[in-house]
Swiss-Prot record:
Domain of life: Eukaryota
Pfam families recorded: CENP-K (PF11802)
Keywords noted in UniProt: Centromere, Chromosome, Coiled coil, Kinetochore, Nucleus
Any single Gene Ontology cellular-component annotation: kinetochore
Protein name: Centromere protein K
Principal subcellular localization: nucleus
Regions annotated as coiled coil: 96-159
Family listed: Belongs to the CENP-K/MCM22 family.
Protein's gene: cenpk
Organism: Xenopus laevis (African clawed frog)
InterPro entries noted in UniProt: Centromere_CenpK (IPR020993)
Any Gene Ontology biological process: kinetochore assembly
Length: 274
């Protein structure tokens, strides 16, 4: 029940008949209106059907419709509001009925508005939760960004240089270890030919010529590695008498070294790192 219904007059029972005077008055008014309608109907019947022109029938109908609407508009402008009845009981019953209809319509509107308001509150709560979650993510990312900026500021060029120098030192130390291990392995498994040295000494004593000092396999490989790394555009080694031929042939046979395509006296190390 709406808040203003307590101000309405007492209910008039639908089962109890209205006062006789009010009923008689309403019946008389209805009969008068009915007589007016009959008179209008008889006038329309007597006027007979109106003949339409052969051309522009649609235009003619539209013009007649405009005339009818204009006449109706003028009648409504001239007409003054009429009271249903002067009887207070009739007016009270009609007013109460209209107020009850309005109250029902307003209650329906209120119920609909409340339902929409409830739904909007739920949607607003969901949106607020989503917004809070997004704000937390933004705050976390902003905090992380500030931390990275601080770290980047503290990470100076001197520190970068020191890190690179330390890594380079470790690489060089590791390289020396590998070369040392390679030298020990080659010295153990690929020693210089003793007989060749002895024969060279004998020939030196007989002919008086200087003997050729052969280069170890370790030294040959180290030269080839250095040439490949320092001068990659020209990594070839020119073969000389102190390069023992069996070592050279072994390197070529096992694919460790390659000959120059135009000069067989020049070899290079296979680029295993590429």
């Amino acid at each position: 029940m709406s808040g203003y219904q307590h101000e309405l007059p007492p209910n008039i029972s639908k089962t109890s008949p209205a006062p006789e005077e009010a009923r008689e008055e309403l019946l008389q008014q209805c009969e008068a209106i009915w007589k007016q309608m009959e008179e209008c109907q008889s006038k329309l019947t007597m006027s007979g059907p109106e003949t339409l022109p052969e051309t522009d029938v649609q235009l003619y109908l539209l013009m007649m419709q405009v005339k009818a609407l204009t006449a109706e508009y003028e009648q409504w402008q001239k007409r003054t509001p009429e009271i249903i009845s002067d009887n207070q009981d009739v007016l009270l019953a009609v007013g109460k009925e209209e107020l009850e209809k309005i109250a029902q319509e307003l209650e329906m509107v209120l119920s609909s508005v409340q339902a929409k308001n409830k739904k909007l509150k739920k949607d607003l709560e969901k949106e607020q939760n989503w917004l809070d979650g997004q704000q937390k993510i933004v705050d976390a990312l902003t905090s992380r960004q500030d931390e990275l900026k601080n770290q980047l500021t503290a990470f100076s060029e001197k520190r970068v240089y020191q890190d690179i120098a330390g890594k380079l030192y470790k690489v060089r130390a590791h390289k020396e270890e590998l070369l040392s291990a390679l030298g020990d392995f080659l010295e153990e498994h690929f020693p210089l030919p003793q007989e060749q040295e002895n024969q060279s000494k004998k020939k030196k004593g007989q002919s008086g010529k200087k003997s050729v000092q052969l280069m170890t396999l370790h030294e040959i490989l180290e030269i080839l590695i250095n040439k490949l790394m320092t001068t990659p555009h020209d990594p070839y080694l020119v073969l000389e008498p102190h390069h023992w031929p069996p070592y050279i042939e072994m390197l070529l046979r096992y694919g460790i070294a390659l000959r120059h395509p135009e000069d067989p006296k020049r070899i290079r190390l296979e680029a295993f790192h590429q």
